[in-house]
From Swiss-Prot:
Protein name: Zinc finger protein 394
SMART domains: KRAB, SCAN, ZnF_C2H2
Organism (species): Mus musculus
Gene3D superfamilies: Classic Zinc Finger (3.30.160.60), DNA breaking-rejoining enzymes (1.10.4020.10)
Comp. bias intervals (Polar residues): 26-41
Family stated for the protein in its record: Belongs to the krueppel C2H2-type zinc-finger protein family.
Length: 521
């Protein structure tokens, strides 16, 4: 295609970072040939968003696309399967429904399997969400652990006020044209005119109405209830428009006692016995039981449990009104929910690699990457396929392998009897037929696989895209670079099991083993 248009794609190394081939190499800022390492995600966005009007002409547009695509997919570093993984992940995120897409992208999945798991988790939560304009205690309480209640109880009335300030009052789907107002929802919990006994009967049945008749809305209830905790949940279908419904779930003990003294025999004192503090243990005057974090529901059979999936939608809605990612990176403005995640991310910019392998001296920016690397020395393969028993060093390799069982298609070679997968059958049969369909245009040499032809062509072009970050020496093959790097690190991964001597290259080990064979003979 490029030849027909008169545009020759830039060499593989042009405009790219030259990096040491290892699992976390994007963190090597200093290895950039141009001195400014660019995040692959940034290059992906630039690749997708490039407009013809931004460049001088068709040749420059094509050249720019080549450059951005290679910075994004990094063919000098990633394998074909890893590149396919990136492409499939991007397309998967693109075709997701809008409500799922935003949630999954926010979690920055690194693989298709991780993205699918996130989408499935949120889909379950959305499927189980009530489509009506009511929220039950069972829907909220049963789905959360005590630890999650603890997190939600930290919310403040301000969240609800901010969420409804711009829209004013919000129509609740399924409740005719009645409206929801923050003060109205809060006041219904303690107002004397609200017929508390009837209200508590509805609470005991597990149903909290979204709107109750209320008194004067001009009173400053925020001062009276400074520690009121509010839950928010999306209600209604996407077509009708979703609505955030606030629900009071905690009132401070001091405010409750104060209100009880003022009301004496009013229904608010009864209600105060059932909605207690979100900051500690509270004793209910009717049953005398201590309830963790002070949450007491009249129906004692309603207890939180550990089903997190059905609460994901609720938690995500709450996060939308919070500062979701308070820890910001000064270099790229990326946000994180936890400080530890920010520290890990910053190593990409600083190039810091605090984790070192004791066997070969190789360093890593993440402890998880070191653990994976160490398995190359120990031979450990902790991930076993339940179908065939084959073991793998990494979970992603197991996931990739398990796809082959989804459509089991294995064939027996008639020539040698070897069992091969359908994807490898034609390649295997070329061994017997002596077929070499890929021919070099310079020297007429033929190859069985296209990748072998590409590697060979570098001997003619002189292209050496793989550079050693220690001494600057360049190589045409990544495998040759890896072997060379062992001269700097001192790594000797190949061990003779007879005498224990170690070697940098497998060929050296084979040559050494002949010594033992000759001595035996």
């Amino acid at each position: 295609m490029a030849a027909g248009s008169g545009v020759v794609p830039p060499p593989l190394g042009a405009g790219l970072c030259t990096v040491k081939v290892e699992e976390d190499s994007p963190g090597n800022q200093e290895s950039s040939g141009s001195g400014d390492w660019q995040n692959p995600e940034t290059s992906r966005k630039q690749f997708r968003q490039l407009r013809y009007q931004e460049v001088a002409g068709p040749e420059e547009a094509l050249s720019r696309l080549w450059e951005l695509c290679r910075r994004w997919l990094r063919p000098e570093l990633l394998s074909k399967e890893q590149i396919m993984e990136l492409l499939v992940l991007e397309q998967f995120l693109t075709i997701l429904p809008q409500e799922l897409q935003a949630y999954v992208r926010d979690h920055s999945p690194e693989s298709g399997e991780e993205a699918a798991a996130l989408a499935r988790t949120l889909q379950r939560a959305l499927d189980r969400a009530s489509p009506q304009g009511f929220m039950t205690f069972k829907d909220v309480a049963e789905s959360l652990t005590w630890e999650e209640w603890e997190q939600l109880a930290a919310a403040r009335k301000g969240f609800c006020e901010e969420s409804t300030k711009d829209a004013g009052s919000t129509v609740v789907p399924g409740l005719e044209t009645r409206t929801v107002n923050t003060d109205v929802i809060l006041k219904q919990e303690i107002l004397k005119e609200a017929e508390p006994q009837a209200w508590l009967q509805e609470v005991s049945q597990g149903m909290v109405p979204a709107l109750t008749k209320c008194g004067d809305p001009s009173e400053d209830w925020e001062e009276k209830l400074p520690k009121a905790a509010v839950l928010l949940q999306l209600q209604g279908s996407e077509e009708q428009g979703r609505t955030a419904i606030p629900l009071l779930i905690g009132v401070s003990r001091e405010e409750r006692d104060s209100k009880n003294n003022e009301s004496e025999n009013s229904g608010s004192s009864v209600l105060g016995q059932h909605i207690q503090t979100a900051e500690g243990l509270g004793t209910n005057s009717q049953c005398g039981d201590d309830h963790k974090q002070g949450f007491h529901v009249k129906c004692h059979s309603v207890k939180p449990h550990s089903s997190v999936d059905s609460a994901v939608g609720l938690l995500e809605t709450q996060r939308q009104f919070q500062e979701d990612k308070p820890y910001k990176c000064d270099s790229c403005e990326k946000g994180f929910r936890q400080r530890s995640d920010l520290f890990k991310h910053q190593r990409i910019h600083t190039g810091e690699k605090p984790y070192q392998c004791q066997e070969c001296g190789k360093r890593f920016s993440q402890s998880a990457a070191l653990v994976k690397h160490q398995r190359t020395h120990t031979g450990e393969k902790p991930y076993a396929c339940p179908e065939c028993g084959e073991c793998f060093r990494q979970s992603s390799h197991l996931s990739r392998h398990q796809r082959t069982h989804a459509s089991e298609k294995y064939y027996k070679c008639e020539e040698c009897g070897e069992i091969v997968h359908v994807s490898s059958l034609f390649r295997h049969q070329r061994l017997h037929r002596g077929e070499r369909p890929y021919k070099c245009g310079d020297c007429e040499k033929s190859f069985r696989q296209r990748s072998d032809l590409f590697k060979h062509q570098r001997t003619h072009t002189g292209e050496k895209p793989y550079a050693c970050v220690v001494c600057g020496r360049r190589f045409s093959q990544s495998a040759t670079l890896i072997k060379h790097q062992r001269t700097h690190t001192g790594e000797k991964p190949y061990k003779c099991f007879q005498c224990g001597e170690r070697f940098r290259q497998s060929t050296h080990l084979v040559r050494h083993q002949r010594i033992h064979q000759n001595s035996v003979s």
